[in-house]
Amino acid sequence: MLKLPANTDLQMTWYNTSHALWMAGFSIQQLLVTWILVGILDQSPETVGLAQLLIGVPALIFMLWGGVIGDRVDGRGLLIQSHLLSIIPPLVLALAVYLDQLGVWILILTALVANLLNSASNPARNTILNLVAAGRLQWAISLSTGIGAIATMIGTRVAGSIDQIGLVQVLLLQSACFGVGAIFLIGLRASGPSTDAPSPNPNASSTALPQPSTYSTIRAGLVYTWRFKLARDLVGLNFFSSFFNAGAWMVAIPFIISRVYAGDALLLANITVVFYFGSLIANFGLLKFMPLSRPGQVYLILQLSRVLVLYLIWYEPSMTWLWIAAAFWGFNMGVTNTMSRVMIQEIAEPAFRARLMSVFTLGLMSATPMGSLVLGIVIGQFGELNALIPGMLASIMIFYYGYKRSDIWQYRSPVLAAPDPA
């Protein structure tokens, strides 16, 4: 196993603890939003898809802004502020529940604010990991993703217990996760702007050129991503995948649980926990093999295996096989997400890393609500199970493009200097 220096171990501990608390709080929100819409407010598939779109899309602007800020300011300070501000939306929603004022619009507004804060802070969170990883980026990414999966499982299971614990109490726990996470962030070293980014010179002439505007900085990041074909391919393929696959998980699975299997919030939570358990196994299993020489090949091969998972669920299997399918879907997601993130963070130039990560995360986050809207319409017209068919076709197309039209299959990790054993 790779061993990190002691001071790096401590920094990783602070980072992963705060990251785990953030993921626990955010996973509580994700399941609560879905089940409140489907199981409590009894909304139609089209309304659920539209609500997910309204919650997710406005956060896209903040994602690009977060990438700019992540390259310019102390990322630790930005994360602390995001944690503290994230305490507020669950408290507002808890008050609405207590006053018997829970409705679609108050749910959308509070979830939207939480999503905006997540979008603004995510690029800085990813960039800080590069700093604390101490040259073991693949290992650190896999470890943090695995720990995040554990936290997500715990948060999801807590959210699924609203009938036993109470909705207000669960929302208070969500706020506590964000608040305690801010405390652990204090242990991180301050992280200033990118080392390759221009810094002000006190001895420079007063006629020196001003700092680029936020707009021009965002534009530079988008242009950098577009002209970098491998980065463009990874961002585009992940968007395409998330549109149909993450969208299906967000909208189709809750309706499949509710209508096909006559389940409740606890069953949805347990299925989600099994999903993230599969992701957990994937990420901690990857630690044994890190660093990988050819992450792109792993990424593409797993696209084909996802087709089998979606087909199994579409076939309307017994509950036992549904558990198995959910676990392998999570395993698949854990590997593909980690591999794509590894490649993006390895190929990014330091001065553009936060902005490239913001574009990458933007693709993932924008695809899910858009896919939710489209697949909500598909469910309304063709049924819950048929919303899985587009994901099967998309996975086949991703493999074909990545193998034939992109350098993803040939990509080799720069962290390995030894010849490829293959």
Predicted regions and their residues:
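Hydrophobic alpha-helix/TM-entry signal in multi-pass membrane transporters
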Residues: 11-19, 48, 79, 107, ...
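Substrate-agnostic recognition of the 12-TM MFS/MFS-like secondary transporter fold
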Residues: 14-30, 54-68, 74-89, 106-163, ...
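A single, central transmembrane helix in multi-pass transporters
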Residues: 20, 28, 167-172, 217-283
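Transmembrane alpha-helix termini and helix-breaking/packing motifs in multi-pass membrane transporters
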Residues: 34-40, 93-99, 154-174, 254, ...
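C-terminal transmembrane bundle of multi-pass solute transporters/carriers
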Residues: 60-65, 72, 76-78, 82, ...
